[in-house]
Amino acid sequence: MTDRWTLSQLSGTIRWVLSLEYAGGTWYLGQESITIDDGTGGTIVISDGLLDLADMTETLDLWSTDSPRRSVPVEFDLGVDVAALVEEGHDLAGCVAELAQLADGDDWSARRPFVVGRLQEPQYGADGEGVRASIEQDVLSSDETIDVSTIYASDLSSALIATGVYAAATFPTADVVAPLVIGAPGDGTVAGSKAAYTCTLFVVATGLPARFYVLAGHAVAATTVTLANPSDATTVTTPVLIVTVNGIALSVAVEDTTTTTMTPAPVPVVTWLGGGLIDETGGVLETAGDFIAYLLRLTEQQVDHGRTNAAREALRAFRVGTYLDESTVIADYIREAVLDIVPVSLAVGPRGVYPYVWRWDATATDAVAHFDVTEDPDIERDGLVTYEDGDRIVNTLQLLYQWNPQTEAYGAEIWAVGDPASRPRGLRFGGSTATLTRSYWTDPVLATSVGRYGIRRETLETAIVADVLTAEHVLAWRSRRWALPSRVVDYTCPQRWAWIEPGDLVTVTDPDLAWSERLCLVQSRAWASDGSVRYTLRVLEG
């Protein structure tokens, strides 16, 4: 299967094929009877049983924090008495189905899955009446969780003593939580996470006591950290020790009690002088793209790794610094903590789910195709240009970031402004106060928005961003998205144009709209029964 339809494939018929796991077998249904290669040396017989399809649309749900869902109504006839099979115990509800596209001459392994899921609310009648249902594919709709480890002080103490470096002393009987640490919370300048005092042991070589604090429930890249007592702000810089406890690699801070400059604290806060989690694919996990890829790997979703890796590269400028100290539902965390902060939407493609990265700074040179209605009369506008999101305009945005567990508050803020008067009173560009580091960022599109619509304010909080450069990137893409209303319009094209996919950039020349190479984003692609495709285009404003 190619990543895109080729012109050779699009010059022939694109067939729809429904495969259904039911009653102990696999059924293959199309809109005509054909026999194809299965890709392994055998053949597959596709029966003429796919009666009707509707809403064959691939949509990129841009800037949505909801999980993507694709639902396709289908009507089919298996050629058998379904009512009798149901009474024999073969339940239609919930059986797995795949609707795929197949080009002339391709074998089954080259098909392009359009939707894979279970039949929802199927309807059936007598023999010959067929079955009606919807195939629904949900992404990140499960309750899979990111789990943090709970460590008993006695287990950690035993593991340390087993190394021969330490001897028994005292330790609490309570358990402690070993958090997940991503990147450098606090950006290496302020406290970014919490540690937990676990035990005190003697160093065998010196006979002197050392205190041990659990930093993370995994190996980290940092070799030293700074601990601080949140009550009196005394600090100490300690080495980081990796020790395995019950099969879990823990990162532990080792405090020399004879030289420490910190007064004892059961839960000190941590300033990270290096990175956190080491990604299993290599390197320190510290960018938004790497973080999203990591979270997707924790799910049971089929992931398009090729497109996910491309997204990782596109998001290198967005650094992540955060920690989790309680189990969290992955889907909820992605929706609530990540998707509002980075220019990403989750999308579903033939190879699985992937993060689509919106190119907010794209230009006409990034377009993959040019629609010119004056040169190609087969390209036709379908309907009127529509304004959207006029009620969601924001041109003055306050971003609170760099969560500090010591103060239990955000340590920094940055403003995106189009009008200097919309800045907080009494503060200058780049100024600061005793409680928050404040700075400002602007874009001409914000000034345009203020001039047209007046000041529209919003405050956004994020616990996953710790550095100012990433904060500026967040303001940049959100300003380009929400400062102005967005316009959408549909164009219908012959099938030969169907290689263009949702997420692509195109330019449009249409004298009726006074457009000359207007840059647009392809939001959706709909396949019509006559072989044409309809594209919904979103104008990139600004």
List the predicted regions and their residue ranges.
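Solvent-exposed beta-hairpin/edge-strand motifs
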Residues: G217-S231
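Surface-exposed interaction regions enriched in Ser/Thr/Asp/Glu
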Residues: A228-Q302
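C-terminal extracytoplasmic interaction modules
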Residues: M1-R111, Q123-A133, D138-A221, W272, ...
